[in-house]
Amino acid sequence: SERNAGRKLYAVDNAFISQHENALLTESFGLRLENVVAVELLRRLHSEYEQLYYLRKVQDFEVDFVVVESSHVRELIQVTYDFIDPSTKLYNREINGLLKGSKLTNCNNMTLIMMRGEKRDIEVNGKIIHCVLAADWLLQRKY
């Protein structure tokens, strides 16, 4: 199956990540942000009908979080630390991951959570991706 549960590991406290020898590298900031989002999503998903997965097609794309409710994909969420320069590989990887995930799951509710970047909606191929700052996303009441 392309939809997996339990293969990505997250720490219940981001302080545990600080113990890693490369904790101050930029990639680590992205890992920490993804961990914060994972813990918050697990806190918000309280119903037995709601589940959290990630989606990966090896060597093709990955979606960090797939929110499923009663066997229906409700939202695709991608997390990145920097989302500033549209010409970068990172920018394209994040957008393409959401678009390919949307096509595969038939879900058009896509969110990109970032620490740095511009809060906006991006339209690509007729689909809307909501780009939100992590602080705003963490403070909203959703689910």
Where are these regions (language model features)?
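Mg2+/Mn2+-dependent nuclease catalytic core
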Residues: 82-100
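Short active-site-adjacent structural elements
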Residues: 63, 85-88, 119-123
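Active-site ExK catalytic segment of metal-dependent nucleases
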Residues: 68, 73-86
